[in-house]
């Protein structure tokens, strides 16, 4: 049984996406204010606990072993080093710490046990913990839940049709199955996509429709802007129009009124004025820190200045009960 109260059709979402920008921002902002404290901003900190050497062929990713990029494979980080970085992040104001590993899937080995220990230790710091480890088994998801994991990130990247043009080593169905495993475990899901890869407006609309018609609505919907990386197939991809980014964020807010909408990778491309429009249009979460996995992010001091200028305040950790579904509505 689906847990949201609105059955979104593809045409519904298409109509929202193509609403005149001023009206779309107004509608999205009203929905944000009716479901959240409008001045709250969730600040997330991302740690790459295992960088590079991935066997997959995601066309946008510097960590693929199939491409010649600036990334050199590194061994997995030690528990103490990850916890120390997480502690510093919390001191800087982060309320969620995300752990990313360049794996196709998690394996039942000492490295997975190391992740469990990291999750427990960082949760003890008072921060929500999110992991992105690739595909999971039900047993692994249960272990992560028992360790205290709050959320699991597993993006769909784009529409089913466009996805096939950027990734061949993992199917769309594989990704959907992983989301099902995570939902079954009681862990919240973080799932969104990447814009600016050469996809069409319709691909962005279809991605949101796939997420909106699942049995469980994502707790977080990250919107990433492609960061073209030398050596990857998308290295020469021209930038997407800011207005398309804004439409995607605003549409996500309307369709997922109680989810966090995260302005994620690629935010460094945007001016403070453009980011402000994104916040008005429904984004209420960002990544905090100078680097996101292998790409640049906004300077921490500049972010702090922007947050102060806009009068934003940190969103506390554990604002939504773990695994609690977000109910979509049109109010």
Swiss-Prot record:
Its EC number is 2.8.1.6. It comes from the Bacteria. Its cofactor is [4Fe-4S] cluster; [2Fe-2S] cluster. SUPFAM superfamilies: Radical SAM enzymes. GO terms for molecular function: 2 iron, 2 sulfur cluster binding; 4 iron, 4 sulfur cluster binding; biotin synthase activity; iron ion binding. Signal peptide: none annotated. It catalyses: (4R,5S)-dethiobiotin + (sulfur carrier)-SH + 2 reduced [2Fe-2S]-[ferredoxin] + 2 S-adenosyl-L-methionine = (sulfur carrier)-H + biotin + 2 5'-deoxyadenosine + 2 L-methionine + 2 oxidized [2Fe-2S]-[ferredoxin]. Binds 1 [4Fe-4S] cluster. The cluster is coordinated with 3 cysteines and an exchangeable S-adenosyl-L-methionine. Binds 1 [2Fe-2S] cluster. The cluster is coordinated with 3 cysteines and 1 arginine. Homodimer. This is Biotin synthase. It comes from Chlamydia pneumoniae.
